[in-house]
C-alpha cells in the first residue's frame, strides 16, 4: 500500500479512478486496488471504453493510469 499512498498524495484524481473501477464490480480485493491494475484479471478499468493495458500488474500500469488521468483532465478543461 506504500505505492498507493504515495500516488494518491501526488494526484487527487487517482481516488476517483479507483472508486470507478470498484463500482464496475471487477475489482474486489486489496491487491488489485493497490497495484492499480483495476481488474484482478477482469480488466475493471477497461469499462472506460476499450482502454487496454491495465492488466500489466504492479509494474508499468501505474504510469499508464496516471497519464490517462492527466489526459482526461485536459479534455474536460478544453470542452468546459
Curated annotation (Swiss-Prot):
Family of this protein: Belongs to the UPF0512 family.
Protein name per its UniProtKB record: UPF0512 protein J
Organism in which the protein naturally occurs: Dictyostelium discoideum
Lineage: Eukaryota, Amoebozoa, Evosea, Eumycetozoa, Dictyostelia
Amino acid at each position: 500500500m506504500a505505492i498507493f499512498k504515495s500516488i494518491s498524495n501526488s494526484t487527487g484524481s487517482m481516488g476517483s479512478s479507483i472508486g470507478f473501477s470498484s463500482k464496475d464490480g471487477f475489482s474486489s480485493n486489496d491487491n488489485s486496488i493497490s497495484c492499480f491494475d483495476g481488474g484482478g484479471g477482469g480488466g475493471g478499468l477497461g469499462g472506460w471504453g476499450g482502454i487496454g493495458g491495465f492488466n500489466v500488474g504492479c509494474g508499468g500500469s501505474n504510469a499508464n493510469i496516471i497519464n490517462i488521468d492527466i489526459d482526461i483532465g485536459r479534455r474536460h478543461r478544453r470542452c468546459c
